[in-house]
Curated annotation (Swiss-Prot):
Functional summary from the UniProt entry: Essential for piliation.
The UniProt record lists the keyword ATP-binding: no
Membrane-topology annotation of the record: Multi-pass membrane protein
Family: Belongs to the fimbrial export usher family.
Organism superkingdom: Bacteria
Organism the protein comes from: Haemophilus influenzae
Record's keyword terms, sorted: Cell outer membrane, Disulfide bond, Fimbrium biogenesis, Membrane, Signal, Transmembrane, Transmembrane beta strand, Transport
UniProt main location, coarse: membrane
UniProt name for this protein: Outer membrane usher protein HifC
GO molecular function: fimbrial usher porin activity
PANTHER family: OUTER MEMBRANE USHER PROTEIN, SLR0019 PROTEIN
GO terms for biological process, alphabetical: pilus assembly
């Protein structure tokens, strides 16, 4: 709800009147004699004899219909000659927001005519109540006259386009390592940004990388500067489509079927346009670093994330949500140069949909892998439909010159869990080999939650039953290889045959939490089966947190079996600090680690970690890291060294640069939709809608994330702004579109508080309720009891003021003044106000 910062002079004025003249109220009669019958100010006080009376004008209010909030809007009150008081005008904007049946409205407003249509006449069966103190407008009327909408519904006409602006996210990681024999350094810069013009949004993401290696023998390997382009596209939404149109380089966002890169056109639905109550993921990456290590995450061959982590377990839970499938490859480069990697499965299973709801995508264009675009033209259509409350139908078609595929499946919700299954048929042609392959793939999954006992079971089986089943990427890749080598070369390609996954999580109450997972998979062209198991348990003993992780990996083709155990302990050391210890064993390798970490600062904007580790072979390492978060981004640094004389240093920074009509603002990394705040002269005020965000010197700040097609509340805490800055409101509402950049302008004024203790030449104080204006006729303040003029509207540091308590020359006086408008403190001056002689 919007709040007001009321001017100090108005509060003082009202308080002075009440203290000076105790009033006995009877039958809601307003005693106009307090103000000289109103003649002094030219105000008709009779209107205030009516309950909840209001002056004509424009106001901001929260709109409610039968106690259901509809949102925030400007409302207009105008004098009604028939009743002799100001009444609410029924404007086109208000009509749209109330969302009533046609039968409820007997007189509609005309958008091209400014004549006020009074709400009492337009909706005779409704009762309007404006509560000025709470800034609320409430309408009560029969429920049958309201349109039944889902909870949280917002009319598309209220979606806000936002402002023209540009933004660029950056994620910089500099890594330097070396020993007496080899030294290396690398630089990674991830970029994600674009430009907004009207309803259109241009977006691009990519990464720049560079590395250098130097050996003691004099050999130097200076890698080339490399920029890897990701997506570059133009997009806008359309309410009529309940979706968006995308043109350029993008990934198909199919939740079922195959996902791939295209350069072309896509039309797809967007469930976020639905009301929140009608709406139906990037995975969390977990791992363990033995030393201060660089972690890179890749999807579909493209680096999407890179960070330096200290020794010990790490969790990465801030990956950008991805609308397409593709396992994540996680690479861990230790400070001694060793590189380990593992796979995090990521497959977007088609969820169940509400009855009657439709999700679709139609995409076409040239096939694209990473930064390369090929000649093959691809057309894909995806359709999902909620047939009943329990059954969702899924279908997909994929077509190119040498490849066709079709998918049909269903999602089934039952009392014993949720099932999904689909079958895919494929036809792949290899012209240079003069062969074609027809194959099929079957897939099924099952999941169930036992909330009563805290059990979650997910069973997913992927089975490729046919040797001749090929995906689109398989087919295009093989055909290009055959063409490159004139059909003489047959590359070895591993195509999945069977894959089975199962995971179980169990809450044991005070006994902790248990997690079990396993997967097994094999390939047509490869003998043997790969199997992985993982068992994890976590609990707390008094203030000591502990966990244990057991895992096993078996490769039957090579006969290799890898067993590992990981044990961790964490002991709090007061508020926001802890000591951590871990023990891990993998095969014959044993590692132990001890560390201290925590956060500090008024808003915990600083964090640190210090670690020491060793293994059973005498290897020892030490590392330290420090990070800082503030309004303009986050910064990190780390250093490590070991007993093998390896040393590494890492520096990192992430944030955003936003260009807009009020200038350029540095920010924390921004999301798909975000908001720019501007409040003139309010530098230092905290933004309540963003962590560790304050207005900069120019009165600008960025709220890094907003939710599209929903009401977002943007608030400011003015306590850290200058004392003489006055906010008209400290909270605003916005309803941004997807990919929009909202501009939230908080109107402010510099309330330089100057008190003039005015006396007339005869020694009497200037009459209370007098008004003062400057030489240009602009209002500067009111006179309260004792002849004190609250002059908070001064615009010039010196000049002449005219004080009036009537229209006659004898009811006026003048005086000259000189003050400091930059002084935020209250200034007090004793002055004689001269009357006409």
């Amino acid at each position: 709800m919007k709040t007001k910062n009321f001017p100090l002079n108005k509060i003082a004025f009202a308080c002075t009147l009440l203290l000076a003249n105790p009033v006995a109220w009877a039958e809601d009669q307003f005693d106009a004699s307090l103000w000289g019958g109103g003649s002094v100010l030219g105000i008709d006080f009779a209107r205030f004899n009516v309950k909840n009376a209001v002056l004509p004008g424009r106001y901001e209010a929260q709109i409610y219909v039968n106690n259901e909030e509809k949102g925030e809007s400007d409302i207009i009150f105008a004098d009604n000659p028939a009743t002799g008081r100001a009444e609410l005008c029924f404007t086109p904007k208000l009509q749209e927001m109330l969302d009533l049946m046609d039968e409820a409205i007997v007189k509609s407003p005309n958008a091209e005519d400014d004549t006020c249509v009074f709400a009492s006449e337009a909706i005779p069966k409704g009762t309007f109540d404006y509560q000025g103190g709470d800034m609320k407008l409430k309408l009560e009327l029969p429920q049958a006259l309201t349109i039944r909408r889902p909870r949280g519904y917002i009319a598309p006409s209220r979606w806000q386009t936002g402002t023209n602006a540009a933004s660029a996210n950056y994620d910089i990681n500099y890594y330097r390592s070396g020993n007496p024999e080899v030294k290396s350094k690398s630089l990674y810069v991830g970029l994600r940004g674009g430009v907004n013009l009207g309803n259109w949004a241009l977006r691009h993401n990519g990464s720049f990388s560079r590395f250098e290696n130097h050996s003691s023998s004099g050999f130097t390997d200076k890698g080339k500067n490399h920029y890897e382009r990701g997506d570059t596209y133009l997009q806008r939404d359309f309410a009529l489509l309940r979706g968006n149109v995308t043109v350029g380089d993008f990934f198909s966002t199919a939740r079922i079927g195959e996902s791939f890169g295209l350069r072309g056109l896509r039309i797809a639905s967007d469930d976020r346009m639905l009301a929140p109550s009608q709406r139906g993921f990037a995975p969390v990456v977990r791992g363990v670093a033995n030393t201060n290590a660089k972690v890179s995450i890749k999807q579909n061959g493209y680096t999407i994330y890179q960070i330096t982590v200290p020794a010990g377990p790490f969790v990465i839970n801030d990956l950008y949500a991805s609308g397409y499938s593709g396992d994540l490859t996680v690479e861990i480069q230790e400070s001694d140069g060793k590189v380990r990697s593992f796979i995090v499965p990521f497959s977007n299973l088609a969820p169940l949909m509400r009855v009657g709801h439709l999700r679709y995508q139609l995409a076409g264009g040239r096939y694209r892998i990473d930064s390369r675009t090929f000649d093959e033209r691809v057309l894909q259509g995806v359709l999902q439909y909620g047939l009943t409350n329990h059954l969702t139908l899924n279908s997909s078609l994929l077509y190119t010159r040498h490849y066709r595929a079709g998918l049909f499946g269903f999602g089934l919700n039952t009392p014993i869990g949720a099932f999904s299954a689909d079958a895919t048929w494929s036809h792949a042609e290899f012209p240079l080999k003069k062969v074609s392959k027809n194959g099929y793939s079957l897939h099924g999954s099952y999941s169930i939650n036992f909330n009563e006992i805290g059990t979650n079971l997910t069973l997913a089986a992927y089975r490729y039953s046919s040797r001749d089943f090929y995906t689109l990427s398989d087919t295009i890749g093989l055909n290009r290889t055959f063409k490159q080598f004139s059909g003489a070369y047959l590359p070895e390609i591993y195509r999945p045959k069977n894959q089975f996954q199962v995971s179980l999580s169990q809450s044991l109450g005070n006994w902790g939490n248990l997690y079990l997972s396993g997967q097994t998979y094999n390939y047509w062209e490869k003998r043997g089966t790969n199997t992985q198991y993982q068992l994890a348990y976590a609990n707390r003993f008094h203030i000591l947190n502990y966990s244990i992780n057991l895992s096993q990996s078996i490769d039957k083709e090579t006969g290799k079996r890898d067993n590992s155990i990981y044990l961790s302990l964490s002991l709090p050391l007061g508020d926001n600090h802890s000591a951590d210890s871990s023990y891990s064993r993998s095969g014959n390798d044993i590692n132990q680690r001890l560390g201290v970490n925590g956060s500090f600062g008024e808003r915990h904007q600083w964090s640190y970690g210090i670690n020491a580790s060793r293994n059973n072979q005498g290897y020892r390492s030490y590392d330290a890291n420090l990070a800082h978060n503030n309004s303009i981004g986050s910064y990190r640094a780390s250093y490590s060294r070991d007993s093998l004389k390896n040393r590494s240093t890492s520096l990192g920074a992430s944030g955003a640069v936003v260009a807009h009509k009020y200038g350029i603002t540095l920010s924390q990394p921004v999301g798909e939709s975000f908001a720019i705040i501007h409040a003139k002269d309010a530098a230092g005020a905290k933004v309540e809608s963003g962590a560790n965000v304050s207005l900069d010197y120019f009165g600008n700040a960025v709220v890094p994330y907003t939710s599209p097609y929903e009401i977002n509340y943007i608030g400011i805490n003015p306590s850290d702004a200058e004392a003489n800055v006055e906010f008209e409101a400290t909270e605003r509402q916005i309803i941004p579109r997807a990919n929009s950049i909202s501009l939230v302008d908080f109107r402010t004024g510099k309330n330089t508080m100057v008190l003039f203790n005015l006396t007339l030449p005869n020694g009497e104080p200037v009459p209370m309720a007098s008004t003062a204006q400057d030489s240009e006729g602009a209002f500067v303040g009111d006179v309260v009891q004792g002849g004190v003029l609250f002059a908070n509207k001064l615009t010039q540091p010196k000049g002449e003021l005219i004080v009036k308590w009537g229209e006659r020359e004898s009811e006026q006086c003048r005086f000259h003044y000189q003050v400091d408008l930059d002084n935020a403190q209250i200034q007090n001056h004793d002055i004689q106000c001269k009357t006409a002689e």
